[in-house]
């Protein structure tokens, strides 16, 4: 079936169907919630601090301080269940690992600590330092495993295809 549209070339029925489908697709894209994601960049947010606010350089410093000091004051390290005891203290609860040791504070200089205890605490600090995670937060283009394309680009392609369908007899 062929239509005449105001001195434009002949338009076939399948051309009209394709144009209508493209218009419906463009309107669905505009109204969908996926139109919020207009860029296809992946942004990463990195947090290098662990649950108790001690970054890896401070842990390294503490490790070196404990290994080099014999008569100086040392830091007490206690085992804590971080998930149960520290949920309400503005710590990041979304990290992948829970840390089992927390630095409580400085001990009294006169308290006697055996070297084996210090060595054990050093190895535990070292373990905590190795499990510090870098949290990756993906934003924007990847949602439900589908690559989001900018909406303006999709509209441009749809309009181009519609014009090509109109011009081809």
UniProtKB/Swiss-Prot annotation:
Its main location: membrane. It comes from the Eukaryota. The chain crosses the membrane at residues 10-30, 149-169. It is found in: Membrane. GO terms for cellular component: membrane. Keywords: Membrane, Transmembrane, Transmembrane helix. It is a multi-pass membrane protein. This is Putative uncharacterized transmembrane protein DDB_G0280915. It comes from Dictyostelium discoideum.
């Amino acid at each position: 079936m062929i239509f005449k549209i105001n001195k434009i070339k002949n338009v076939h029925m399948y051309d009209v169907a394709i144009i209508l489908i493209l218009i419906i697709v463009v309107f669905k894209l505009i109204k969908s919630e996926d139109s919020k994601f207009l860029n296809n960049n992946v942004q990463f947010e990195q947090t290098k601090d662990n649950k108790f606010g001690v970054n890896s350089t401070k842990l390294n410093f503490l490790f070196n301080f404990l290994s080099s000091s014999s008569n100086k004051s040392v830091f007490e390290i206690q085992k804590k269940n971080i998930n149960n005891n520290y949920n309400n203290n503005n710590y990041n609860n979304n990290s992948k690992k829970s840390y089992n040791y927390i630095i409580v504070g400085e001990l009294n200089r006169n308290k006697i600590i055996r070297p084996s205890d210090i060595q054990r605490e050093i190895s535990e600090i070292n373990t905590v330092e190795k499990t510090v995670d870098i949290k990756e937060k993906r934003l924007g283009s990847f949602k439900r495993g589908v690559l989001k394309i900018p909406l303006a680009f999709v509209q441009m392609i749809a309009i181009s295809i519609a014009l090509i369908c109109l011009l081809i007899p």
